[in-house]
Amino acid sequence: MTNIRKTHPLLKIINSSFVDLPAPSSLSSWWNFGSLLGVCLGVQILTGLFLAMHYTSDTATAFNSVTHICRDVNYGWLLRYLHANGASMFFICLYLHVGRGLYYGSYTYSETWNIGILLLFAVMATAFMGYVLPWGQMSFWGATVITNLLSAIPYIGTDLVQWIWGGFSVDKATLTRFFAFHFLLPFIVTALVMVHLLFLHETGSNNPTGIPSDPDMIPFHPYYTIKDILGFLVMLTALATLVLFSPDLLGDPDNYIPANPLMTPPHIKPEWYFLFAYAILRSIPNKLGGVLALVMSILILAIVPILHMSKQRSMMFRPLSQCLFWLLVAVLFTLTWIGGQPVEHPYIIIGQTASVLYFLIILFLMPMISLVENYLLKW
């Protein structure tokens, strides 16, 4: 008798995606982050749903409703901090997932890669709007500064900003629409995730060697299901530790002050996971130039497949490219640090140097070093 999981119309899809899926036998722990991102998304949607039951998106009551959740709702403090720190875990997993793709050449699956870039933008937009909702000082001023960047767009910029604000400044209309979009976007992200997986399963997974693994495949279950479960336990332990011991470690103390349009905080900065892009934005003195650099800092991922000059897919056997990759990681850490510092000497010049290096490594040095490696291997 044929197993029901192979014949039932719905179970058949689940079976071919998570049970009988042929997977390369050599996948390392770097391949765990896709499933971890799925868990993060699930945690964020669930905690967000319960928070939305008690939150009010009105400038007069938003800050107090968050206080009410933390003080009066059963385990409301836990929901709030799981949601806030869950976003941090989400971005840690996201950046490691993208880094894995860059290192092992997974970007050669261009459809999967491009949907991934769309996902990155969607998650960043969701996180930005979520940061505005508690209506603290950094929420208000962060929203003001970032939405104002759109005014750099020639001709339509000012109208566009006022259209997004729903008035002449960040106010009640802005908060209400940001809440609506913050609620909606995670479901769009979920749909995009399904498309991402659909394209991935068309080609099959890459592996650390970058060599086709068709002759050596193993079923996803039980080998990788058990491996993923271990990953879940490690990540959820890290999240629980963060939430229960130092929930405000990654937040900004200014956000515990209710939003006040008449008082600007000394240093306006976004959450830590946007600091690298914020540093690139600030390192260019021209407003439009800064906005273009900000967008390009993420959009540059879309042209990485075109810049792939190596005859080998993965960096596993390319020591020169590995050195450049880890230099890029160091540059990103430097940019993240600079994004949180005030705009003064020597931070300005460090930020500008790191920004130039970031684009230089991806656009010129990596393709050039790949050609050098090809030559050294006489390919």
UniProtKB/Swiss-Prot annotation:
Binding-site positions, heme b b566: H97, H196
Keyword annotations from UniProtKB, A to Z: Electron transport, Heme, Iron, Membrane, Metal-binding, Mitochondrion, Mitochondrion inner membrane, Respiratory chain, Transmembrane, Transmembrane helix, Transport, Ubiquinone
Pfam families listed in its UniProt record: Cytochrom_B_C, Cytochrome_B
Gene3D superfamilies assigned to the protein according to its UniProt record, in alphabetical order: Cytochrome Bc1 Complex, Chain C
Gene Ontology terms: biological process: mitochondrial electron transport, ubiquinol to cytochrome c
Subcellular location: Mitochondrion inner membrane
Signal sequence residues: none
Cofactor comment text: Binds 2 heme b groups non-covalently.
Ligand binding (a ubiquinone): H201
Amino-acid positions noted as binding heme b b562 in the UniProt annotation, renumbered to this chain: H83, H182
Molecular function (Gene Ontology), one example: ubiquinol-cytochrome-c reductase activity
Gene Ontology, cellular component aspect: mitochondrial inner membrane; respiratory chain complex III
Topology relative to the membrane: Multi-pass membrane protein
Membrane-spanning ranges: 33-53, 77-98, 113-133, 178-198, 226-246, 288-308, 320-340, 347-367
Cofactor(s) needed by this chain: heme b
Taxonomy, superkingdom: Eukaryota
Keyword Iron: yes
InterPro entries, sorted: Cyt_b/b6_C, Cyt_b/b6_C_sf, Cyt_b/b6_N, Cytb/b6-like_sf, Cytochrome_b, Cytochrome_b_C_euk/bac, Cytochrome_b_N_euk/bac, Di-haem_cyt_TM
tRNA processing keyword on record: no
Subunit (UniProt): The cytochrome bc1 complex contains 11 subunits: 3 respiratory subunits (MT-CYB, CYC1 and UQCRFS1), 2 core proteins (UQCRC1 and UQCRC2) and 6 low-molecular weight proteins (UQCRH/QCR6, UQCRB/QCR7, UQCRQ/QCR8, UQCR10/QCR9, UQCR11/QCR10 and a cleavage product of UQCRFS1). This cytochrome bc1 complex then forms a dimer.
UniProt miscellaneous comment: Heme 1 (or BL or b562) is low-potential and absorbs at about 562 nm, and heme 2 (or BH or b566) is high-potential and absorbs at about 566 nm.
Protein purpose: Component of the ubiquinol-cytochrome c reductase complex (complex III or cytochrome b-c1 complex) that is part of the mitochondrial respiratory chain. The b-c1 complex mediates electron transfer from ubiquinol to cytochrome c. Contributes to the generation of a proton gradient across the mitochondrial membrane that is then used for ATP synthesis.
Family statement: Belongs to the cytochrome b family.
Protein name: Cytochrome b
Protein's gene: MT-CYB
